[in-house]
Every structure is written in structure tokens, then in C-alpha cells.
Amino acid sequence: MKLKSFALTSLTFCFAAICGTPSVQAATLTTIVNGISNARAVSFGPDSSLYVAEPGIGGNGNCQPSPSTLFQPICAGNSGSLVKVASDGTTQRLFNNFESIAEQPSGNQGAGIQDVQFDSQGNAYLLTGFAGYPGNRDLESLNLGANFPIPEQQLVTFPPSTPDKVLNTPLLAQLFKADLNTGKLESIFDFGKYEITNNPDGGDVVTNPFDLTVSGDTAYVIDGGGNTAYKIKLDGSESEAIAIPKKVLSASTLPPLPPGQELPPGLVEVLPGGNIAIQSVPTGGTIGPDGALYVAEYSGFPYPENESRIFRIGDDGNPEVFLDGFTQITDLTFDEQGNLLVLQFGDESQLQGDLRFLPGSLIKVAPDLTRTTLVAAGEGLESSAGIDIGPDGKIYITKRGVGPELGSVVRVDNVVTERVPEPTSILGLLALASVGATGAIAKRKRQNKLSEELLAKAEIV
């Protein structure tokens, strides 16, 4: 069951429960924009404008059960947008009333516009999510899905819709070349159709494209529903799908159930010897200093703490574990010094608290693999979803990524931290330390500095 709650302390850092990584001084978080519904990625355009993906809150249209919400219905509407904050601080919504699906009546766990990124010529590319069986998207995909198999457990928990109950959201689960001035969209890749016809990880047939990175002539898309990383030529001429493997854990990590209740079929894979295999649910991707793709995972039910991994995918297309011991990662990026910045949605399992306000954190992994907590749990990064480095070289993060109008983008300032050596990782040392800071490739193309007008409108929180 491909689970992404959102849709979406520590074996981390030298086993932080033993070593500890307290911040000497709490970082200052400066609010740039707020009032975003189910906020996702943050990015910067060629003119230094800031963009925030707003999947929306669904609506009163047709519904489908979703693995993203542990099979609770998510319903369609037109409430999504792309929020633009210009360099003078002016805010506007592009693609307003875009297709959206979310829980009702709460409006939580939205899927819609997920990310926007730009190539070196300034062209914009828009990614949309879905969070369910792609055959339910519209009549065309439903008819396509009728020709391909669906696992038995999926038929029990989130089956295909009937023709009169499809969501009528044909723009979801796609990658587009986008004209931000006219609103014109040109489809480059349809993840819904690809998942139906290919099912790269061999599990449930479900898709939820979550993260986009553009580098050179290639788009890199991380599909948290399909447990897959994609490499797609921007002209649509070639594509490659790389399945991200499950993680094997002791069955003792499963939470106790009330008497008489059982886990829904397919929620976890039960293995011999008292073990289980859980979904990876990858959520973030970035290109490293070595040119490889780095993929972060959130992990599926039961969302165990300290078990999320970061994979490195080189030219051979084989995902190898680069780092382990994180909790519910939603995004990552490299800065100009070659440090890997890792954003944790919550430092505790989402089963332990309110999904809207989990204590998230920001971790820096240096080229020598030293891990440092830049913003610790409880210091203001609740349920954080996206990260980028701004034109001013500072870190920008979307927080409170679940719920209507709760989301915001904050800038991270005044970071003073302790450093804790990372346990030996030969792979990591070879991959990063030998490259050096001068070779660092940031996730998104850096633009000119933000204007003083935008920063002047920021609010210290």
C-alpha cells in the first residue's frame, strides 16, 4: 500500500538520543507569506519572485478512498493555485481555481499543484499530484485501467470508481510546461497513465507526484504514491522510472490495535520471521555535487521514527541507501557549500499527534557527513513540506503543510548550532567529501538577490 500522509527522534545524528544535538541558539524564522492551503513546494523564478504550490482544499465533487488518508475519502473541487510573491512584496494567485482533491469537510491532505520549477532559459514547469488510484481520475483513465490488473488488497481498500463517480480531474498527476502569464499548460508526462500501464514498483496501482527538480534538459520527479523516481526529458522524448525499495522492520514496530480490530489488507507486507516491509513513500529529490539524484523518503504506515532513508541514484539507475536514521523527510536540497539540507515534516510519528502541527526540524549534513540540527523540533517548523535556497543564499521553508489557510513560507535566520560527527559511511564520504564545496549543485537554479522591498515586508515570528 503506497501511503503518503499529506497527501504525507533519533537514530539520526550519531543516534541523537545518546549524543544529543541541541541548538545553542534558536533560529529566527521570518514569515514571507502565509494563508496557504495545504502548502507544498517553495521555489524562486528568474525574476526573483517566490512561488508556493497550493494544492487547495478539494470541494464537493466526487470522492475516492485514498491510501494517503488511510482510505478515508478525498473529494474533488477547484480550489488550488500557485501563489506568487513578487520582488516588491505583491502577492497574487496564478492558475486560480485549479483542480484539487482533499478530505472533506476538513480540507486537509490536499493534492493538486505540487511544485513549480524553472529551466536555465526561464521556462516554467508545473507538477500536479493525485493521491489515489489513477483510474479514478477521469473516464479516459478509468477505461484504460480496465485493461490492466489491480492487486486484490487494493480492490478491498481503494477500488476503481464507477463511471459516474470518477473525479473529473484530468489535469492531476501530470508534468506540464507552463506559461505563467497566459495560464497555458502543455503536457509533458502523464504519471496516471504510466502508473496504470507500467506500475514500476509492482505494488498497488496508485500515484501521487510530489516533488520536481529541473536540471539541464531533464525533469526529476519523485512520486510518493508510486514509490518511484522519474527522469524525464523536458521535451517528453525519453523517460525512466526507478522504483524505490521498501524497508524491512520488526513487526514490533506496529502499533497495538483495539480488541477485535485488524489492519486493512495490504497496509503493510508481513514477512517470515516476525518482520514487516513498509512502503518507502519518497517525497523529495535533488541533484548532488556529484551529479547523482538524491531521494528522501517519508516512509509509510506505521510511520516509524528514525527509519527514513536518503537514497543516491547514480548513472546505473540503482537506488543505494546514502544515509539513514531520519524521521518523515519531506524535502532536501544542497546549498552552495555542498551541505545537504534535510527537512523533516515531524520528528515524531504522525500517529502521535495532530498532523497539522507536528514538530518538524531542519538538519544540515556537511560534506564530511557531520550532521547538525539547524532548527530543532519545537522551534517553529511545524509539519514542514518544502525547502529551497533563495537568491539571497538563505533557506526558505514551507511550514504547516496540512490544512486550509494554515501554511506559510518562512526564511531561516541567525542559525547557531552544535555539530555532532556522523557514524562512518564510506558511501557518503566517497559521494560528497571528495567533491568539495565548489562543485555543489543546488536543487534549484539560484537567481539574483531578493529585493529589499520583499524582505522589508517580512514579519518576524
Feature locations, PLM:
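Residue position within the beta-strands of beta-propeller blades
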Residues: 51-54, 126-127, 221, 294-296, ...
